[in-house]
Swiss-Prot record:
One of its GO terms (molecular function) is sialic acid:proton symporter activity. PANTHER family: CARBOXYLIC ACID TRANSPORTER PROTEIN HOMOLOG (PTHR23508), SIALIC ACID TRANSPORTER NANT (PTHR23508:SF3). The keyword Transport applies. It is found in: Cell inner membrane. It comes from Escherichia fergusonii (strain ATCC 35469 / DSM 13698 / CCUG 18766 / IAM 14443 / JCM 21226 / LMG 7866 / NBRC 102419 / NCTC 12128 / CDC 0568-73). This is Sialic acid transporter NanT. It catalyses: N-acetylneuraminate(in) + H(+)(in) = N-acetylneuraminate(out) + H(+)(out). GO terms for cellular component: plasma membrane. Keywords: Cell inner membrane, Cell membrane, Membrane, Sugar transport, Transmembrane, Transmembrane helix, Transport. Belongs to the major facilitator superfamily. Sialate:H(+) symporter (SHS) (TC 2.A.1.12) family. Catalyzes the proton-dependent transport of sialic acid. Coiled coil: none annotated.
Amino acid sequence: MSTTTQNIPWYRHLNRAQWRAFSAAWLGYLLDGFDFVLIALVLTEVQGEFGLTTVQAASLISAAFISRWFGGLMLGAMGDRYGRRLAMVTSIVLFSVGTLACGFAPGYITMFIARLVIGMGMAGEYGSSATYVIESWPKHLRNKASGFLISGFSVGAVVAAQVYSLVVPLWGWRALFFIGILPIIFALWLRKNIPEAEDWKEKHAGKAPVRTMVDILYRGEHRIANIVMTLAAATALWFCFAGNLQNAAIVAVLGLLCAAIFISFMVQSTGKRWPTGVMLMVVVLFAFLYSWPIQALLPTYLKTELAYNPHTVANVLFFSGFGAAVGCCVGGFLGDWLGTRKAYVCSLLASQLLIIPVFAIGGANVWVLGLLLFFQQMLGQGISGILPKLIGGYFDTDQRAAGLGFTYNVGALGGALAPILGALIAQRLDLGTALGSLSFSLTFVVILLIGLDMPSRVQRWLRPEALRTHDAIDGKPFSGAVPFGSAKNDLVKTKS
């Protein structure tokens, strides 16, 4: 940027069309967050009505994560082939229909299937909305684009918590899911009133359709084998997370089978850059493992261990959700200032100072607990707002929606595992201790993976001929693309 451009406030670098594109995507993501977290709010009510165990109840949260990898792949490929806008609208319709089905569910299996549909829609919304906004904004503002957008999910969670406190005591838990059908009206408006993403239009202007991940996996020479592996992965995940298996060894074997299938898909679709894709899935896996025990089971912790009533639960969840929303925006500013990876590491390190006090303070002082949760979620959860930008930078435009959607949502299986891990540990410890210890320990893994830029580093170790040295979104260099000390030595040579 020129000196003159740098002196202009950041928001003046955006025109009306770019703001409209962002606003539409942000509202879509808000509705996504609203629909998705409803199950966490009414988990105890559903558990009581259906007579579920704690692990079975937690698996209803996990169900949406089980289908996300496939939704991210399919709807991401739709976004790469036909445009980000169509994929975004389709995603909203999917998760809205799934939410309505939850309201009519007569039992556990039906609700589990409805949650699978929600997961597919959520995955598509994440990948399509994120690429849509990031590709519509100027390069030097794309961390802000990512962070501001993802804040919509947390705002949706806050709105859902407030609606829960008003609706459920009067009309029961099913009424909450009936409200979730409203996003379809918004989807119809989106289809007519928002432009296509600029990067996608420039890349595809006058050119033949791109070969998407769906084309490679399900229309290529290995399509039969890939269809069989897809069914095998879906079946394995069903048995792992539907509460049907009690043998940890069998679950571990099925988990390894799924991992092998997903790695195979990544190798086929990304070629020599598969080490980067696999490591991105690992990064996201641990990002969900550290954050989602709290996201999924915090309402249960507040209602059972702290004995809060629905109104107090809603107030505490407001602090938590609002903190995450503010953190997404703060993360956007930090990312554009410090760089994406450095901002991520600094924010997570600061959040570690708060995670133990959150679960050690107890429930005597609601306001202190709410304040601690606000800052912990702002620093620990909010920084994930720039995760789409971090992942998207490793993929070219014509593969970005599917690449982001697939890697992110395969890694998001950590979100399926997280509440079940928390519930299992809580059978031996109290739930607060289980949530705090999981989050505290696994956050350090994410700090190392992102701080050391392991996707680029492992790519350099295994397939250096396909190494990308600079971020495809903002053009900044990847620190893991060069050995330790090389950049410093180059700087010394330049000065001399």
